[in-house]
Design a protein with these regions (language model features):
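A glycine-rich, often tryptophan-bearing local segment used as a flexible ligand/cofactor-contacting loop or short
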Residues: 183-263
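Membrane-interface motif at the C-terminal end of an N-terminal transmembrane signal
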Residues: 18-40
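N-terminal Sec-pathway targeting helices
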Residues: 1-16
């Protein structure tokens, strides 16, 4: 073998090695923060509209037109702090080492052609698998308003993904706040329920078990929510069963944080009213 042939052969080996490294150890998908997700989702909400709330509100052009026509808005509402009420917000901001878990998997479950199309009979079991969680929607079903309010007040956030990939992350925080984290993995369930100070801001959390495929960023329902038939609470979690009925109280007129063995549980679903209820928000920091 002459010198030139050796160089070509060596170069070929190097190329093959690089190819194998890249394909067998692909670059991890860069994790996106809740703040970045909120900014992306509400990028079209640029029209400020006066209101009687303690927060500024922004709408899309389409929703302003619909509002003027007395039609229901379609694009949610973006909430921001008001420069005129900064002193008020100081009473609502977190005062200890607290983390909130944004339910990105639950958002995916409620998406079009997702789990709920199967539950309603509009789709077969294909709607229970390969459901993408790459573009979460900050809607009522995924605690969209609650997420916004807590985020702008300065609460720290992680997502379901962070907990599933690194369950020990919760050990870094004194208090863990759950939203409508209805669909979780077994690893998530174990890590969350092992924590000593939980605040459940939503009934129906930790209800059904999913499996996550990080190669294509999708989820699949394993069991729970009457799948297969007869399996409602996938984890037989007594706390969820105790508070499940409160899921349908979205006015929270008689709200109360009820003490459980490792924290507190709210007795209503606050996402439709939390932006009106500063007393409830203030109570969170004291638990």
């Amino acid at each position: 073998m002459n010198k030139f042939t050796k160089i070509i052969s060596f170069g070929t080996v190097v190329i093959i090695v690089i190819f194998l490294i890249v394909n067998l150890n692909p670059e991890p998908v860069e994790e996106i923060t809740v703040g970045e997700l909120l900014k992306k989702y509400f990028s079209s909400h640029v029209i400020k509209k006066s209101n009687n709330l303690d927060f500024d509100t922004y709408f899309t052009k389409n929703d302003i037109i619909r509002h003027n026509q007395k039609l229901q808005i379609q694009d949610e509402v973006r909430f921001e702090l008001s420069s005129e009420k900064l002193e008020l917000y100081e009473k609502l901001k977190p005062n200890k080492n607290t983390i909130v878990i944004y339910p990105i998997f639950t958002s995916a479950a409620y998406s079009d052609n997702g789990f709920y199309d199967y539950y309603s009979g509009d789709c077969d079991e294909s709607c229970l698998k390969d459901i993408s969680f790459e573009n979460p929607e900050f809607t009522y079903d995924s605690s969209g308003i609650t997420t916004q309010i807590l985020h702008i007040l300065g609460y720290d956030f992680i997502t379901d993904i962070d907990v599933d990939k690194n369950p020990k992350i919760l050990q870094n925080y004194e208090t863990v706040i759950l939203l409508h984290n209805e669909y979780v993995t077994q690893k998530m369930f174990d890590a969350i329920t092992a924590h000593t100070n939980l605040i459940f801001l939503s009934p129906n959390a930790l209800y059904a078990e999913i499996e996550v495929n990080y190669d294509n960023n999708t989820i699949e329902l394993i069991h729970g929510h009457d799948y297969p038939p007869g399996v409602s609470n996938a984890f037989d979690y007594e706390i969820e069963e105790q508070f499940h009925e409160y899921e349908y109280d979205n006015e929270c007129l008689e709200w109360e944080f009820i003490e459980i063995k490792n924290g507190y549980h709210l007795n209503c679903y606050p996402d439709g009213s939390i932006h009106y209820n500063l007393e409830l928000i203030a109570k969170i920091k004291d638990l």
